[in-house]
């Protein structure tokens, strides 16, 4: 029998030490990884609840286990809130991750070997958009489009040319490292021209979409997926959305369960319900606008300091800095910034001469620092510190000076007050 007073402390101190160290790292380091954010204590409360004990294979009102009357209410709340938040007719809140949501879409709409057209990973796409190392590139005939390296923008005429030539069954619009706004009407027109499904992966910009600050793909796409963390600030998980289409809804549901998953994680679904409610609060739009303002201000600092920002700037929460002209690698830059307690991620850039493990770029995002309370003033200062380190790569004195300034800034803006 378990006691309500059971604690990790005193029982598993080795684990607790690692957990506490990570929480302290989050407080002491500035987080600029575009896919990371801080979630609320309300979300954590739901995710750490007794709902983790309940198996609930199936869907609300149609389960394969008894005792699901209460978790049915939890899942239905999450579904209704997701639909309301994004203006969708259909929502599946069960995918354990964005990649599993994407896998369910493939399973629902395609046969193995079908042709899909997605954005190249090297140009800002995602692994699940047809990369050779992913299921999407192994099980399907994946054709890739990219950006015009002269402009840093997607060349929609080229996307259309490839689509006409290759006749994909599904076209994927979405990214993990593209800083400009996608033209969903143009993607829809291209898909219609070749008779393809249009699948939009909005994982990175879902929070901006929810706030009305980025175009909503729902009116144009046959199906939309997203993660529930990143700009949404919820638990790590996935979500599938669509307009009303009974045939497709059945396919999506079957592709998630039993096609790709067994029991849903009811504690995570509860946490998703919390984050959807939080995203409907009035302050959420102001937060997302600040995310964009901060990213644009930081990108301009890099441009002013002589660095190449891919696509010339940003419309969203992230941007890519190319270090090719400086002769630096993303790996070395990432490590140097880490020593100064600034966390970014190395990232491939167009025409990158380095391997994906080394790269010639950095991806920088502002969701986490904005949650922390940073405004444009702090982000401009922060971008300047990063440029100082890049201009003096490997200089321990510069790293130490920046680290001390980072410590002071983090103390002024704690993650959890």
From Swiss-Prot:
Its EC number is 2.1.2.1. The record marks 229 as: Plays an important role in substrate specificity. Keywords: Amino-acid biosynthesis, Cytoplasm, One-carbon metabolism, Pyridoxal phosphate, Transferase. It catalyses: (6R)-5,10-methylene-5,6,7,8-tetrahydrofolate + glycine + H2O = (6S)-5,6,7,8-tetrahydrofolate + L-serine. Its cofactor is pyridoxal 5'-phosphate. It is found in: Cytoplasm. (6S)-5,6,7,8-tetrahydrofolate binds at residues 121, 125-127, 355-357. The modification N6-(pyridoxal phosphate)lysine is found at residue 230. GO terms for biological process: glycine biosynthetic process from serine; tetrahydrofolate interconversion. GO terms for cellular component: cytosol. Pathway: One-carbon metabolism; tetrahydrofolate interconversion; Amino-acid biosynthesis; glycine biosynthesis; glycine from L-serine: step 1/1. GO terms for molecular function: glycine hydroxymethyltransferase activity; pyridoxal phosphate binding. Signal peptide: none annotated. Homodimer. Catalyzes the reversible interconversion of serine and glycine with tetrahydrofolate (THF) serving as the one-carbon carrier. This reaction serves as the major source of one-carbon groups required for the biosynthesis of purines, thymidylate, methionine, and other important biomolecules. Also exhibits THF-independent aldolase activity toward beta-hydroxyamino acids, producing glycine and aldehydes, via a retro-aldol mechanism. NCBIfam families: PRK00011.1. Belongs to the SHMT family. This is Serine hydroxymethyltransferase 2. It comes from Pseudomonas syringae pv. syringae (strain B728a).
């Amino acid at each position: 029998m378990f006691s309500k007073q059971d604690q990790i402390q005193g029982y598993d101190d080795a684990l607790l030490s690692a957990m506490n160290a990570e929480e302290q790292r989050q407080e002491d380091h500035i987080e600029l990884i575009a896919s990371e954010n801080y979630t609320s204590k309300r979300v954590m409360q739901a995710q750490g609840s007794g709902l983790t004990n309940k198996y609930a294979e199936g869907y609300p009102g149609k389960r394969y286990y008894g005792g699901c009357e209460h978790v049915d209410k939890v899942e239905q709340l999450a579904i209704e809130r997701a639909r309301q938040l994004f203006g969708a007719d259909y929502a599946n809140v069960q995918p354990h991750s964005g990649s599993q949501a994407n896998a369910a879409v493939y399973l629902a709409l395609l046969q193995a070997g079908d042709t899909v057209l997605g954005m190249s990973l090297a140009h800002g796409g995602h692994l699940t958009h047809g990369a050779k190392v992913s299921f999407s590139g192994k099980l399907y005939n994946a054709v890739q489009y990219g950006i015009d390296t002269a402009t840093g923008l997607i060349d929609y005429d080229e996307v259309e040319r490839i689509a006409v030539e290759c006749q994909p069954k599904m076209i994927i619009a979405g990214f993990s490292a593209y800083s400009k706004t996608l033209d969903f009407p143009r993607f829809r027109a291209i898909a219609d021209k070749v008779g393809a499904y249009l699948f939009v992966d909005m994982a990175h910009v879902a929070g901006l979409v929810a706030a009305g600050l980025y175009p909503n793909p729902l009116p144009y796409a046959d199906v939309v997926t997203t993660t529930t963390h990143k700009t949404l600030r919820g638990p790590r998980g996935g979500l599938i959305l669509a307009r009303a289409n009974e045939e497709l809804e059945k396919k999506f549901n079957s592709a998630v369960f039993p096609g790709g998953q067994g029991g849903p994680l009811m504690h995570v679904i509860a946490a998703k319900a919390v984050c959807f409610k939080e995203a409907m609060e009035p302050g959420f739009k102001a937060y997302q606008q600040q995310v964009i303002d901060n990213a644009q201000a930081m990108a301009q600092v890099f441009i002013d300091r002589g660095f190449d920002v891919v696509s010339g700037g940003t419309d969203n929460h992230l941007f890519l800095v190319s270090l090719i002209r400086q002769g630096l690698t993303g790996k070395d830059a990432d490590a140097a910034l880490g020593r100064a307690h600034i966390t970014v991620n190395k990232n491939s850039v167009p025409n990158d001469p380095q391997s994906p493990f080394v790269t010639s770029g950095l991806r920088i995002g502002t969701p986490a620092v904005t949650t922390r309370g940073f405004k444009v003033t702090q982000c401009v200062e922060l971008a300047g510190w990063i440029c100082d380190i890049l201009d003096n790569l490997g200089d321990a004195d510069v790293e130490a000076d920046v680290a001390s300034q980072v410590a002071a800034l983090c103390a002024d803006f704690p993650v959890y007050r």
